[in-house]
């Protein structure tokens, strides 16, 4: 009898700092996830249909579309997709408050995110 393995959870990582996005994707791939890195909120939204992520991990402050805007669109288009945001910017609080006022709640991690903490969140 052939043994079937469960598909790897798909994680889309969005950060306009390419080194951070790529590094997180490498860490996640090595930890047993199928991860892809994109470098803008717009690209994250574009990838929703073709990659079909189980989770979006996004920086909040990015050039163009913010991570919060991408997260809201992600939840609208893929309601089962979990969202985790991270940021090292103080301005994040204002953006989160605006999203909260519109009925959107997001979990946020402080940047830099230690890989152990990130993996614990993803597996928890």
For every predicted segment, state its role.
Residues 1-12, 114-124:
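Non-catalytic signal-transmission and effector/linker regions of two-component phosphorelay proteins
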Residues 17, 60-61:
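The short loop immediately C-terminal to the conserved phospho-acceptor aspartate in CheY-like receiver
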Residues 21, 63:
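The feature encodes the CheY-like receiver
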Residues 22-30:
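Charged docking surfaces used in two-component/phosphorelay signaling
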Residues 86-88:
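Hydrophobic/aromatic residues positioned on beta-strands within the core alpha/beta folds
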């Amino acid at each position: 009898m052939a043994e079937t393995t469960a598909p790897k959870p798909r994680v889309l990582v969005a950060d306009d700092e390419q080194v951070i996005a790529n590094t997180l994707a490498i860490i996640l791939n090595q930890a047993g996830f199928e991860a892809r890195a994109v470098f803008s909120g717009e690209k994250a939204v574009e990838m929703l249909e073709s990659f079909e992520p189980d989770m979006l991990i996004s920086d909040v402050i990015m050039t163009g579309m913010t991570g919060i805007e991408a997260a809201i669109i992600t939840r609208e288009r893929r309601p089962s997709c979990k969202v985790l945001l991270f940021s090292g910017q103080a301005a994040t609080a204002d953006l989160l408050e605006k999203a909260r006022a519109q009925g959107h709640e997001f979990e946020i991690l402080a940047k830099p995110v230690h890989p152990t903490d990130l993996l614990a969140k993803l597996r928890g």
